[in-house]
Amino acid sequence: MTLLNVSGLSHHYAHGGFSGKHQHQAVLNNVSLTLKSGETVALLGRSGCGKSTLARLLVGLESPSQGNISWRGESLAKLNRAQRKAFRRDIQMVFQDSISAVNPRKTVREILREPMRHLLSLKKSEQLARASEMLKAVDLDDSVLDKRPPQLSGGQLQRVCLARALAVEPKLLILDETVSNLDLVLQAGVIRLLKKLQQQFGTACLFITHDLRLVERFCQRVMVMDNGQIVETQAVGDKLTFSSDAGRVLQNAVLPAFPVRRRATEKV
């Protein structure tokens, strides 16, 4: 089943120039893509190529300058109030900048309960039980529930944001460099959790990343973005080989897992 369909999406930002006239900076240009239930897809690209802007459009935080985004066959622009509430529950995003994604005055307990209060019909006791369950799933415990964001490390706060997104059991989870920024042990744990969600609920995942190793370990399909366009799409096999210049640049930038020892006869 197709969850998300994007057709001819373009987006620009207006900013003032020295002459006082508004100038337009193109960020996305004619982007089209589809995401299916239970699918794991990577959006791969260097910083500044338009990945995060695309993600903000997909979750409805901004409206595109041109093109259409459909969720389960319905255009986002035409959703009624009830449909929009269901959409906000069904698609969740974990931002790269976790500090800006939470209210620093609220406790972790309040942060985790917030989407459940607005998007689910759960009693308070059920919300608290699920909050504890989600914390455990991301390798945190109840000791952080009464803490506020400034009292947490960056990695802890990022996992709190992931737990918050998972609490409403979304049908699509968008992760903007979220897993890439965790250490390898936590990465493996989160990936196991996401696989479990896929099996249990058919949750689809869109990884926005520049981490090629993550793509190879977990994703079924990869899209390469460069200068606001998707320049390549392919299935992920045993050995990824890119045809686009942008894909090859990212692949060549990957360091070996272990240092390569030089021979004594090699010149440095």
From Swiss-Prot:
Its EC number is 7.2.2.11. The keyword tRNA processing does not apply. GO terms for molecular function: ABC-type nickel transporter activity; ATP binding; ATP hydrolysis activity; nickel cation binding. It is an enzyme of class 7 (translocase). SMART domains: AAA. Keywords: ATP-binding, Cell inner membrane, Cell membrane, Ion transport, Membrane, Nickel, Nickel transport, Nucleotide-binding, Translocase, Transport. Pfam families: ABC_tran. It is found in: Cell inner membrane. The keyword Zinc-finger does not apply. It catalyses: Ni(2+)(out) + ATP + H2O = Ni(2+)(in) + ADP + phosphate + H(+). GO terms for cellular component: plasma membrane. It is a peripheral membrane protein. The complex is composed of two ATP-binding proteins (NikD and NikE), two transmembrane proteins (NikB and NikC) and a solute-binding protein (NikA). Belongs to the ABC transporter superfamily. Nickel importer (TC 3.A.1.5.3) family. Part of the ABC transporter complex NikABCDE involved in nickel import. Responsible for energy coupling to the transport system. PANTHER family: D,D-DIPEPTIDE TRANSPORT ATP-BINDING PROTEIN DDPF-RELATED, TRANSPORT ATP-BINDING PROTEIN. This is Nickel import ATP-binding protein NikE. It comes from Shigella boydii serotype 4 (strain Sb227). The gene is nikE.
